[in-house]
Design a protein with these regions (language model features):
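Generic preference for well-ordered alpha-helical elements
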Residues: 40, 44, 60, 64, ...
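A broadly tuned preference for mixed-charge, low-complexity surface segments
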Residues: 196-202, 209, 300-302, 306-318, ...
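Fe(II)/2-oxoglutarate
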Residues: 1-138, 334-373
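Catalytic core of non-heme Fe(II) oxygenases with the double-stranded beta-helix
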Residues: 2-4, 207-337, 370-373
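Short, functionally important structural connectors and interaction interfaces within domains
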Residues: 27, 92, 105, 137-138, ...
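Non-heme Fe(II)/2-oxoglutarate
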Residues: 3, 101, 105-216
């Protein structure tokens, strides 16, 4: 088939376009930043790893057409229009905003991360990750991650961006529906850097600790900064994140309060169920220190009573997990309530089997007794 541009590029039949279940992790995807596409270039780079083996080394335009057909099949027109507007919004910011620290926009591992974290990542073993981490509550991991100078530079970059927003009277989108302050890092040039952070630093850890929620197939992200102070957002209500895995790192500065409170992992059906005592956990932020948890782990933030707290948050998502989840009904491998229901069903089944066994044994014993004379 010849594509619509009439340039003679052969594109596989749209009726057979499929993705494979597991990504080609060793494959280096193309760079799509220079193309005018209906979707984010980062999405194409992530999706490329799921192309059939025969497609991986095809010409870039062939791969683009192949992936576009799949995306159009599943993405409504309204979603494409929204994505187009978001791209235009981001381009307007990137064209006009002058970064303060351009070195932040590309990963410089030794400048960004503490040595212990880098060592564990380079070894890429579960025991190496555990050696630098604490697990104060099941499924919640804390560890030192960022260098102090990186935290300070990112804080300075946020202040510079907010100053530009104020001076230019540019109306920006906030990180989510719950935070009225802060900024989406992806919107002012950090998308590629954060994608690299997810791919090379968060996904290896998530693959080891969160395989049941797609930790090994994370392929997109939403990265943002949030601000808490008496004249900013003060606290954050009880919620779950729109992510499979969430990285939350305190950048500073001086503050009191702001503790995170966790209340158990839940699927959509059980998100409003009661908390069990063993699921209660509170966490106090430390600048430079990260906390990693499942996105479906219910949590909130207590009031910041003085000072100013700023956190970097990276929601990491897996399109593969989300697609598979649509066809699943049992989430007992990660939902606390599903797990309790499953254990209760097992307990009842064992109890019923014991009763039945005792009944059979009683009947056998009665049959074996000699008849009364």
């Amino acid at each position: 088939m010849i594509n619509g541009n009439g340039n003679g590029v052969c594109v596989p039949s749209t009726h057979t376009n499929r993705l494979r279940l597991n990504p080609a992790t060793n494959h280096q995807p193309e760079n799509y930043e220079d193309l005018q596409l209906d979707f984010s270039p980062a999405l194409f780079a992530s999706l490329e790893r799921y192309l059939p083996p025969a497609m991986l080394n095809a010409e870039r335009q062939v791969k683009v057409e192949y992936m576009m057909e799949i995306l159009r099949r599943y993405c409504p027109d309204g979603e494409r229009i929204r994505a187009q507007r978001q791209r235009e919004y981001r381009q307007k910011i990137i064209t006009n905003y002058q970064p303060l620290h351009r070195e932040l926009y590309t990963i410089h591992a030794s400048s960004f991360f503490v040595p212990s974290f880098l060592k564990a990542i380079n070894e890429n073993l579960a025991q190496s990750f555990r050696s630098i981490m604490s697990e104060p509550s099941p499924g919640i991991y804390t560890f030192d991650m960022f260098q102090p100078q990186f935290c300070q530079m990112l804080l300075n970059e946020l202040e510079n961006f907010e100053r530009w927003v104020h001076d230019s009277k540019f109306r920006i989108m906030r990180p989510n529906t719950m935070n009225r302050y802060g900024a989406v890092l992806d919107d002012f040039g950090f998308e590629t850097m954060l994608d690299k952070m997810m791919d090379s630093y968060i996904r290896p850890i998530s693959k080891a600790f969160y395989p049941e929620v797609g930790g090994g197939s994370l392929d997109s992200h939403h990265g943002f900064l949030v601000e808490y102070a008496l004249d900013r957002d003060v606290d954050l209500g009880f919620h779950v994140d729109d992510s499979e895995v969430t990285l939350n790192v305190c950048l500073g500065t001086q503050f009191c309060g702001g503790e995170l409170f966790f209340r158990g992992v839940r699927c959509e059906q059980h998100v409003n169920t009661d908390t069990q005592q063993e699921e209660v956990f509170d966490y106090s932020h430390v600048p430079g220190r990260a906390i990693l948890h499942r996105g479906r782990h219910r949590h909130g933030a207590r009031a910041t009573t003085s000072g100013r707290r700023i956190n970097l948050i990276l929601w990491c998502r897996s399109s593969q997990f989300r697609e598979l989840r649509r066809y699943q009904h049992d989430f007992s491998s990660w939902c606390g309530e599903c797990h309790r229901h499953k254990k209760e069903r097992q307990r009842q089944a064992v109890a019923a089997a014991k009763v039945e066994l005792m009944k059979i044994e009683g009947e056998s014993a009665a049959a074996a007794e000699p008849a009364a004379v």
